[in-house]
Design a protein with these regions (language model features):
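Bilayer-spanning, highly hydrophobic alpha-helical transmembrane segments
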Residues: 16-17, 229-260, 272-293, 575-604
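Actuator/coupling domain of P-type ATPases
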Residues: 23, 35, 40-126, 138-145, ...
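Membrane-embedded transport module
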Residues: 245, 508-511, 548, 553-624
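Juxtamembrane helix-loop transition segments at the membrane interface in multi-pass membrane proteins
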Residues: 56-66, 103-113, 291-310, 618-624
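Conserved ATP-binding TGD loop and adjacent catalytic N/P-domain core of P-type ATPases
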Residues: 398-400, 426, 432-576
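N-terminal membrane topogenic signal
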Residues: 1-14, 238
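P-type ATPase nucleotide-binding
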Residues: 148, 341-464, 473, 485-501
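Conserved catalytic phosphorylation-site environment of P-type ATPases
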Residues: 68-72, 171, 271, 281-358, ...
Length: 624
């Protein structure tokens, strides 16, 4: 609890004890009305002074019709009619409901505002032989910073010295620490757990991951869902309407009774009108609906899914088509050796060694993957005369033998017959002294959770999953078949992807949504065009993250199905609260107008319904 909440709790306890004591005393002993008034006024003012103050401020500002005004009128009216205990009780239970709501909002906010804790206070920079703590805003690109164990990584960069494990839970929701070593990219907001790291910054603080996340979090509450906008408009007209209804209930029946000669019974009808006012307070709706979405967004944040507004969370539940980019989204976006097929008298170890040595001078991603798979240090004394053959591959002397490594064109050029029918990725053919040594297949590896992501989406009710890629048809077909995608389109330019999304948008149902999932800078246009743009946050480009409506902080595509599940359950809770609150209030309003429901029933219809609605709303925090 916050200090403010603790103070309110103390006021509630003091007021409740005093109220209970006074009620017992007045039941046992006959006390003068004015003394009763003075006694009940103490707990009433202890618990309700701030509500009365807010109501008066609202009147002076012209913002009359809110819950503070309703409570002030109802309780002051009850006290004026001599219903002292009821007036104090209404204010007491209203404050209990408000405290309950405040604690629930705090709980929901905790998951989101925990992201605020990722903001670093300083960066360790070596200046004139001394390590000094400076403001991250003052650190320039290319600066070498030091991150000690237990400190937050202040700015995005590359590790140039040291190895460690990182706690990324605040960003990704993943509790298992990740290892980090020299050459790895590192994003701000992580907590360094073990070793000392020296990092060369690649961005300014304002453009780093932590700054972008904080900006997104701060602006997320500005984008309201249709349900929230409906409740806001509803309350704008509903509250003045019920105030008018209560006024008519207090005036019209007594006038009619006077005309008919049956006695006005003004006090009775004013009591009914005040009961009507308490029942009609829209707290349950005004509080629980935004709270439900807030809790849903908080639940998503705790699982590493950053939703930029409740309107996007709501839209997820209506998603019909999910369209994926391939590289970096469904696949890792890095080349790896996926097959080694030696020929003639060569074995796998010899084949990969020949290829790695021949490619040793190249920084091409394919060359890097060959050297990585070889896994040993390359002795430069054993390789010489390296020549790059444009559009074909490389040639080199390895252990004094002429080695060629490249595509099929290179083999044909050297009149070397090959036997390799593997076309699932990029194929590197290798020959040694004119003899075919075999082939190595290099592919962009599918992410571990991609198949689970597609399967989960289909189970959740998604009608169609589509992949759009600029890669070859063979590579696209291999990935699409392995993942069980409904449709794929290959060899596309960024503009072609937009065209395909336009086409799919025209095919879907009018009320349904299309979500696009991507990570690259060339995905920004299509992310903006889709109904819902979902970006990869860990390795995704800044442009993609900025254009997206939802960000997956750990690049796990299976989190999309989880986000949709959170959306569907949140919407279900919202609808439950709307129906429940309106139904109970409608019944109690009729009973109040007929004089059947008293002020205690009104308290349940207002505070009781609000507490039940809030309890239901915070269930959105626990969706798994």
């Amino acid at each position: 609890m916050t200090k403010k909440q603790k103070k309110v709790l103390i006021r509630i306890i003091v007021s409740a004890v005093l109220l209970a004591g006074i009620m017992i005393i007045t039941k046992l002993v006959e006390i003068n009305k004015w003394i009763q008034f003075a006694l009940y006024l103490v707990p009433y003012l202890i618990i309700g002074y701030d509500i009365l103050k807010k109501a008066l401020k609202g009147i002076f500002k012209g913002q009359i019709f809110d819950e503070n005004f309703l409570m002030a009128v109802a309780t002051v009216g009850a006290v004026a009619l001599g219903e002292f205990s009821e007036g104090a009780a209404v204010m007491l239970f209203y404050q209990i409901g408000e405290l309950f709501q405040s604690v629930a909002v705090g709980k929901s906010r905790k998951n989101i505002t925990s992201l605020m804790d990722i903001r670093p206070d300083y960066a360790n920079v070596e200046l004139n032989g001394k390590v000094e703590k400076i403001d991250p805003d003052d650190v320039e690109i290319g600066t070498e910073i030091i991150v000690n164990p237990g400190e937050k990584v202040p700015i995005d960069g590359v590790i140039i010295s040291g190895d460690s494990t990182l706690n990324t839970s605040a960003l990704t929701g993943e509790s298992v620490p990740r290892s980090a070593k020299v050459g790895d990219e590192i994003i701000s907001g992580c907590i360094n757990l073990t070793g000392v790291l020296k990092i060369k910054t690649t961005k300014e603080f304002g453009d780093s991951t932590v700054s972008k996340i904080l900006d997104l979090v701060e602006n997320s509450s500005m984008k309201k869902s249709k349900s929230e906008n409906f409740i806001t408009k509803f309350a704008r007209y509903y509250t003045p309407a019920v105030c008018g209804g209560a006024l008519l209930l207090a005036i019209l029946p007594p006038i009619i009774r006077l005309i008919s000669g049956t006695g006005a019974m003004l006090g009775e009808w004013i009591t009914r009108a005040l009961t009507f006012l308490v029942i009609s307070c829209p707290c349950a709706l005004v509080i629980s609906i935004p709270l439900s979405f807030f809790a849903g967004i908080g639940c998503a944040s705790a699982n590493g899914v950053l939703v930029k507004g409740s309107n996007y969370l709501e839209a997820l539940s209506d998603t019909q088509y999910v369209v994926f980019d391939k590289t970096g989204t469904l696949t890792k976006g890095v080349f790896e050796v996926t097959g080694i097929y030696p020929a003639n008298n060569f074995d796998k170890d010899t084949l990969i060694r020949l290829a790695a040595f021949a490619e040793s001078a190249s920084s091409h991603p394919i060359s890097v993957s060959l050297k990585k798979n070889y896994g040993k240090e390359i002795n430069i004394d054993e390789v010489s005369d390296i020549q790059e053959i444009a559009g074909h591959g490389v040639s080199a002397l390895v252990d004094g033998k002429r080695v060629f490594a490249g595509n099929i064109k290179l083999m044909k050029k050297e009149n070397i017959s090959v036997e390799c029918e593997h076309d699932e990725g990029t194929v590197v053919y290798v020959s040694c002294d004119g003899e075919y040594a075999g082939c190595i297949v290099i592919s962009d590896v599918v992410k571990e959770n991609s198949k689970k992501a597609i399967s989960s989406l289909k189970k959740s009710g998604i009608d169609k999953t589509v992949m759009l890629t600029g890669d070859s048809k063979q590579a696209a077909e291999r990935v699409a078949k392995s993942l069980g995608l409904d449709e794929y389109h290959a060899e596309l330019l960024p503009s072609d992807k937009v065209d395909w999304v336009e086409k799919l948008l025209s095919q879907k149902s009018a009320k349904k949504k299309l979500a696009f999932v991507g990570d690259g800078i060339n995905d920004a246009p299509v992310l903006s065009r889709a109904d819902i743009g979902i970006a990869m946050g860990a390795l995704g480009s800044d442009a993609a993250i900025e254009a997206a409506d939802i960000v997956l902080m750990d690049d796990d595509p299976s989190k999309i199905a989880l986000a949709r599940k959170i959306s569907v359950h949140t919407l279900k809770i919202v609808k439950e609260n709307i129906v429940f609150a309106l139904a109970i209030k409608a019944i109690c309003l009729v009973l109040g107008a007929l004089g059947i429901a008293n002020m205690w029933v009104a308290i349940f219809a207002d505070v009781g319904v609000m507490i039940l609605a809030v309890l239901n709303a915070i269930r959105a925090l626990k969706i798994k």
